[in-house]
Amino acid sequence: MFNQEQGTDYPVLNKKKLESLANLKLAMGGHEYPTDDLTQQGLKLAGPLLEEVEESEVNHTTAPIDARLQTFLNSYFAECGEEVPKIPDDTFILDREGLGRVLSFPPHKQEFFCETMKSYKIKQGVLHNPAKDKRTTVGVFHICQSDVPVPADKIECPKIAFLRMLKAAFYGAPDDHLIIPYTAECKEPTRSWVSLYMRPVVVPGVKGVKGFEHEKATEMHFFVPGNMVSCLDFVESVFGNAGNPRLSKNDAALDPLGWTGHSGMAILAPHLTRMTKKECGLPHISQATERQKRERMCWEKEDELYNDGKTFKMYCRDASGVICTIIADNYFGYCKKEVKTQISYSANLYGFAEEEHAGGAIARPSYDLGESCDASKYAEGYKFSEMVEKNKHSIIVKEEGYAVDKKYPEGIIYVPEDSVFTIEDASIKFNHNGKEESILLTPKVNYVLPNGYTIILHDTMTSRRWTLRGILPQYTLCHKPCTVSGGGKSEISKSIRDAVIEGSVFVNNKEEDFKAVQKVFDHDFSKRYANGEVKPIHILDPNVTLGTVVELLTPSHLFTKEHNDYISSISPLIVELVMTIKSLYREDWKGDWQSRITVDKINGNEGNELKYRGANLSSQYLRVGFERDETTWRVFQLRKDFFPAAKLQMEDDITASVIVPTKLLKTPINNMQKKACKIVKNCELRLFQRPDDAVFRGFDKQTEYDFSIPGHFISNYQPMTREEAKDFTKDVVRLYQYTEPMRKCLQDFVAGKDEAKYIVSSSYTRLVPEGDKLVGSKNPRYLQRRPDMLDPEYTYMTFKAIQLYRKISDEEPLYTPVDAVLSGRRNNPPQVAKNGMKLRPLSVFAPLHYFELPELLMECITSMTGASPSMFGAGSEGALTKGPFNSLPAVVDLNNYLLGMICCGYSGFVSSASYCGPHYKVAHDISLLIPEIWSKMIRYEQEPKYLIEHGYLEPCPDVTYNGKTYSGKRLGYRITTAFANHFLRTLFSMPNSVMPEDFLKPELQDLAIYADSYEYMSQTDKGIAMNYVKDGTVEGACPPLKALIYIMANGEYNGMTRESKEFREMFDPEVVLNSEWYKERLVTRQKLEVAKLNKDLAYLNKTIAEKPRLAETLNKQIAAVKEELQYVSSEEYLHDINGSIGTDPYPYKCMKH
């Protein structure tokens, strides 16, 4: 079965071998090749080519995917009465990973320039700057007429126009577009199409669960003119390479249990922007329909260009399972989003699954445990002996009584539950067979308790000291779907560590300040509560946690006025000293802390910088937005025991998810009481990152590290020659603002330590025109290797900890479904975009909102956004932020999303990016904070009911301005001061200072802007909903969604409003899951799968008849398919999939056959 992450079974080749292979392929095709390297080395690499010749598929047989695509095209366009173009079968196939990168440059040149791209070999890899530095979504997406309606937010294209575009794409590409850069310096450059075959994942596999066990992929063939081969290098880097589509072993239809049954094609053809409307077959305006006139799909003058000569993507699809796309541009974002579109298309037709515009991460709480700890309190109820028994296949037990991991013996050590860790003597001590054993405590080793609790000897984020870091095995998988561009999808999985600032701990006057601290320690806290006294509490008591101290010194509505006044009277400096001393204090000090904390003598006088054990004490601070001037940072002190959550990225942008009934799972999960759960998988192998904060030198440490190592694919940065880099690095002060890796990379390049001719800096983006000047691009990009794949030991350790905590054996399946749904919105004050367009404000959102299902669906239907660096303009990104990239009616996605939320019982939260209200700029600071907060919340604290009952969430209030009242119901619930004080205390020393009242209540910042934002949102809600009514796709919506859309459009539906009890009951899980329309979805899934499996059997038998040599392999497939068919045809299957989302029947009902 094909695996996207593993790719083909051919070994990875280095650049020299790839050049040899390229030469061999060119020679076999009768083309000139640019080097003399056609040697025995090259012939050794001919395996794949000789395999093709053996099968006689190169010259005589069309690739199976192309045959499927051609059959579809011939049928689809038969009514047009014109020749259907033949898919080219003589393309240069990129059948080995890395071949596209080699073909992107002449072998002896370090740059390649053409009409559509400027490309450079750089020290860090390759830099490609396409003609446009960003994509637009306005007027771009065109869909060919078919039985399935074309949504109103897309432009409807007549079949004849698509057919003629297809001909012009393949037959009319300019000669210079077809030149393969690798051969550009040859006397006779090779002019050819280049193609890449891919199998992107659509449905994640769920181990051990019948009917869900097999991961399923779609298949896609991507064609580009030769000089755009870098686009295929990009796409391959993100989605992988499925080999040569002409080989039987790569035929998706011969891997039936791993294939959704869907096929796709994409063609890059920027030259099509020169075609006229008349050439395309569009009607004269006098013969055009009203829709064609409205969408300008007609002409008055014969020289009018199609789509006014601007970029467009044109889809041709129906519900049969084949999709073809023409893209009249070569910006990398369009290429990536096209694969996303085809994954989404396949997911919506197949069922069970969703393609989601999402980020996400597993976040585990992490704490500073100090210089010693007794680990027994962290592993209660777990025994080392039991852990050994359940993990006998993955660990090796040592005679001293500890164990090491078989896979990572140097980095993962398992220790007994009674272990005592001490930094002072670098030891871990425990009892074994009646005697004390001891092993060395060393850095960079995961010491794992029987319950998965992990302790690491860590140099702290400050220079204060070495410490023990404890990481809990309990986790929260934060899932950020339906998140607009710039809404924080990537940031949710980034470590907050890069945003942490270090600073020393100071005193004004040691003697006076220490007296003030002692007064706090001596204070009587027993009278703090308004509802009565509690027993006295002493801050330095070892049983009093640092969290309790933060609570004692944070104002609260639960406290008396006198206690709140007392807290307010303590200066921030004294509070910081209290926290510092509490974090260091040990019981054996017996109250004498003052002699342990010192200052140096400077010129005979006491200094101001505190020290402990000879080292400077430090504090950590975190930025949470900016002041109103939008340049001054709002910085707050973190707790003394703060460590960032241990995060493992699970998603970044394109996610495949599957809803699985909980009853089918073989081992426990976090929320077993839920009817179903969502399993997610990242569809991408590399992440197309936009490192916004890298323009601040030294701030984005990850990007600066990435830019210091080779092998990267980079775009929209400014290339520098050695001389330019020399000038760039003369400013020593600014040079040393970079972290060491980026600084050293620049210095080494200037010193001429490598052959590279060009380099880029992480802070110096591509210069693009803006009016009459050049400015840095706001859309710099690079492909980052997925962190979970880059550090497999950390990934393994994360899942191992969870497995141990759940007491699962190492042979049983481990499931880590979504725990929290935390979408993101990008907000903005009123402003003027770079393209001159005036942007209305979107300033009604607080840092975090909770929405009940109807309002959450409204958010998802409209998906409003402020301006993003990725795109021109702002407004609605369409349903679930996927509007531009959904080739089927959006109601299919919305039906799936609504049903998934209901089946899984998830609650919908939405966080803010860019701004909170019109005056607080927050960038991505809230997105970084949310996983830190959520990971430390107890499971019941994450539930809206609990948060509302305890005053942590409040209904958004109705607001009146100029005599008009704006209902707060549309905005759901928002976090309160109580939420900030209570939950931020797990992070900050003084949580009450982080989110002031007007930060949490945007209407207090500027009521006029708030009202205008609300008007804008309401108008957009209505306008978007009216589109579903106009194009008729509202009839494909499930009953609760259909009612909501009509209410958004008209204010009511069958006498119901949004507040009507009858309407809101339509979203009740019991009502939904017992409805006839839900049962129809399950039956549809069964019927489709039975039909597909029968079709698979026929294809397998046909292939055996044509190629008897494949009989042994394919007979095994036939047996597996027959077994699956028997199960899928049964009543048991229908019972088992109850709780899943089934398959939406709407697209199939649209088909006339």
Curated annotation (Swiss-Prot):
Record's keyword annotation contains Cytoplasm: yes
Coiled coil: 1085-1131
Catalysed reactions, as listed in the record: oxaloacetate + diphosphate = phosphoenolpyruvate + phosphate + CO2
Entry's localization field: Cytoplasm, Cytosol
GO cellular component: cytosol
EC nos: 4.1.1.38
GO molecular function, one term: phosphoenolpyruvate carboxykinase (diphosphate) activity
GO terms for biological process, alphabetical: protein heterotrimerization
Enzyme class: lyase
Swiss-Prot/TrEMBL keywords: Coiled coil, Cytoplasm, Decarboxylase, Lyase
Family under the similarity heading: Belongs to the PPi-type phosphoenolpyruvate carboxykinase family.
Function as written in the Swiss-Prot or TrEMBL entry: Inorganic pyrophosphate (PPi)-dependent phosphoenolpyruvate carboxykinase, which regulates the carbon flow of the central metabolism by fixing CO(2) to phosphoenolpyruvate to produce oxaloacetate. Can also produce pyruvate and diphosphate from phosphoenolpyruvate and phosphate.
Subunit structure of this chain's protein: Monomer and trimer; forms heterotrimers with PEPCK1 and PEPCK2.
Record's protein name: PPi-type phosphoenolpyruvate carboxykinase 3
Gene: PEPCK3
